[in-house]
């Protein structure tokens, strides 16, 4: 059912949001059966791409990560995405009453997870870790994620579309803050606790 909804949310989001709203998923189920799989897509893809293919900024010398270094970074990135989804869902649940929402934390997790699906799937671009390619795919996924957010909030939160617009904007702001925080934390970890080892060829 999850895979069916995941495909449906990509091709006909408005009707799929309505179907998702009629079902109930627990937070435990979402983390165990959905986030655990989706978060593995970018983590595993980047591990393979950075250790087996490598990347080149100037188009000449290619750089690869050592397997041990990439493995630690991949594991940290994997669990960081768990935390990011949980933080955004908590923020949605905390803000919902301001905009007239009366749903449970489980519904907030559902909204967060399905909205972020394009970003998780875009992680497949990590198999070819070239900056221009990853940024292009990431921007396309981000645009569609924003579209899913604005269409899904009024349906899942059961609020009018005008309130849903402002609520979606608030959620988007939180999401961008979490993204910046995730990037900053990654840079700090790479420079201190998880230093990366490279090899050029």
Residue ranges of each PLM-predicted region?
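Phenylalanine-focused residue identity feature
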Residues: 2, 28-31, 47, 77-79, ...
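Long, solvent-exposed, polar/charged low-complexity segments
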Residues: 13, 157, 161-162, 196, ...
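Selected alpha-helical membrane-embedding segments in polytopic membrane proteins
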Residues: 2-103
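Hydrophobic alpha-helical transmembrane segments and adjacent short intramembrane/lumenal linkers
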Residues: 92, 99-174, 179-181
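Membrane-helix interface segments in multi-pass membrane proteins
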Residues: 45-80, 126-141, 181-201
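Amphipathic, positively biased hydrophobic alpha-helical segments used for protein targeting
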Residues: 19, 24, 50-54, 119, ...
């Amino acid at each position: 059912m999850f895979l069916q909804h995941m495909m449906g949310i990509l091709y006909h989001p408005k009707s799929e949001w309505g179907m998702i709203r009629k079902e109930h998923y627990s937070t435990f189920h979402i983390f165990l059966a959905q986030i655990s799989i989706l978060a593995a897509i970018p983590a595993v893809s980047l591990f393979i791409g950075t250790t087996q293919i490598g990347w080149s900024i100037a188009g000449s010398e290619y750089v690869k990560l050592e397997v041990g270094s990439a493995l630690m970074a991949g594991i940290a990135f994997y669990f960081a995405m768990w935390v990011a989804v949980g933080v955004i869902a908590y923020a949605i649940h905390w803000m919902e009453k301001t905009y007239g929402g009366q749903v449970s934390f489980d519904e907030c997790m559902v909204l967060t997870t399905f909205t972020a699906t394009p970003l998780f799937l875009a992680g497949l671009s990590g198999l070819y870790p070239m900056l221009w390619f990853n940024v292009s795919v990431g921007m396309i996924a981000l645009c569609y994620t924003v579209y899913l957010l604005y269409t899904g909030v009024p349906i899942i939160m059961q609020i009018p579309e005008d309130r849903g617009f402002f609520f979606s904007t608030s959620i988007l702001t939180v999401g961008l803050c979490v993204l910046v925080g995730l990037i900053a934390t990654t840079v700090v970890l790479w420079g201190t606790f998880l230093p990366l080892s490279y090899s050029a060829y």
